[in-house]
Amino acid sequence: MEEYSSLEKKIMSILYSAGKPLPTERIAKQLDISRITAKKYLLGLEKNGKVGSKKEGRAVYWWLNSSSKVLK
């Protein structure tokens, strides 16, 4: 069973609630953390297949993969 940090759970919950891809900056703002910290956790979740991403211009948009379960 995979274990997630409190921040990873919050990120997945935000993405689930949004129902659409969100840019790194918006996720960071909702969590009151830096974009660098948000990106670090998002990249870890992406490596584990929990989220996907796409770069558009200067922004990177993130979404929860459909196979991912949100842990509250």
Language-model segment annotations:
Residues 26-28:
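A short acidic, leucine-rich amphipathic alpha-helix
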Residues 36:
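Key DNA-contact positions within bacterial/archaeal DNA-binding proteins
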